[in-house]
Amino acid sequence: MKKILLTGLAALFLLAGWFLAGRDERPAPALPDDPLEIGVEADVEPFSYVGLRGELTGFDVEFAREVCRELHRECRIEPMAFAALLPSLKAGELDLVVAGLAETKKRRVDFLFSEPYYRSGSFFVTTQKRFEHFTPDRIPELVIGVQEGKLQDEYVAEHYVPRGARKKTYSSFDALVDALLSGEVNMIFLDSVPGYTLLNHPRGEALFIGGRAENDDAEFTACRVAAKRGDVPLIEGVNRTLHKLQSNGKFQDLIIRFLPFFSF
């Protein structure tokens, strides 16, 4: 069954590649020759982290490098706290942010977004078995940790704090996990891709999934690259890179190499 599914996926990717290749026959717009300054989130596996040989790697990092290759520009990849990424892009310190961003009405005021390059839901993780399947009446017992500036931060503030939960924010993924393991919070709410990576890591041996977001709609799960509003040629270059990688199989290679599951 798995072999049939993967073969079917490969066929779909190939057909998509033929379609997209035809769509992209028009000449690409001229782009500057200076280096591309690309922001990624620091220290969050499997997206951006320091490998065993001391090199910066990860799904977002390698996708960013492919964008630079497609646009024939030198790459300067800047790992930073997630909450600093969009302000740095808005200030002109970055050209792109490759960090699995959701496109929201608020963000569209200042930024332009690519097509989704992967999809990911969100779930709660806990150390306490009693919260593994919590019900709405237990929400006032929750102290929920979230990462500052992420969509999960906004979601908890909107859906759980008004119902009695307490929210604590942390500047990094590691700080968020440390807060859960130390008992500072009894639940964290995070992206499912690094969440599954955590659960398969020795640090996650005593952790449980404590439920999913109540509303995993398309806006909440589609993950995109961002540029400054108006930078259409650059976003078109990102989309062109995505189409090319999907059609030649390299994107699937990146998924198999870094992600715990197919995520489209």
What kind of region is each of these model predictions?
Residues G39-V44, E78-A83, G92-T104, T127, ...:
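Beta->alpha turn/N-cap motifs
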Residues A42, Y118-T126, N200-H243, L259-F264:
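Periplasmic-binding protein-like
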Residues T126-I144:
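Flexible hinge/capping segments at coil-to-helix
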Residues V67, L89-K90, I139, L180-L181, ...:
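Hydrophobic residues within well-ordered alpha-helices
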Residues A84-P87, G100-D110, A157-E158, S182, ...:
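A ligand-binding cleft/hinge motif common to bilobed small-molecule-binding domains
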Residues L15-G22, L151-Y170, A206-G210, N239-F264:
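Ligand-binding clefts/hinges and TM-proximal coupling segments of bilobed small-molecule sensing domains
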Residues D24-L101, V109, T169:
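Extracytoplasmic small-molecule ligand-binding "clamshell" domains
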